[in-house]
């Protein structure tokens, strides 16, 4: 069963495009890009996710990321 998102493909693709444009503007190599994006994820988890939920959300994110590259 497909996962339904509350966000449209247009919203998601627009953000992806802008983020990738910033990385390209700075000519960031892949390892730096991954490090920066990982730090952004950590920042969002720390600032936007309640402490009691943080570990579970991080695990779900890691699982989704792992499944997306299979």
Swiss-Prot record:
Kindly give the SUPFAM superfamilies that the UniProt entry links to this protein.
YejL-like
Family to which this protein belongs: Belongs to the UPF0352 family.
NCBIfam families given in the database record: PRK13689.1 (NF010242)
User: HAMAP family recorded for this chain?
Assistant: UPF0352
What is the official name of this protein in its record? UPF0352 protein Sfri_2492
> Where is the organism placed in the taxonomic lineage, from the top?
Bacteria, Pseudomonadati, Pseudomonadota, Gammaproteobacteria, Alteromonadales
């Amino acid at each position: 069963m497909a996962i339904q998102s509350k966000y449209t493909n247009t919203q998601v693709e627009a953000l992806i495009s802008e983020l990738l444009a910033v990385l390209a503007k700075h000519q960031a190599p892949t390892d730096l890009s991954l490090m920066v994006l990982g730090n952004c994820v950590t920042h969002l988890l720390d600032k936007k996710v309640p402490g009691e939920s943080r570990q579970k959300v991080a695990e779900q994110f890691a699982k989704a990321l792992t499944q997306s590259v299979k």
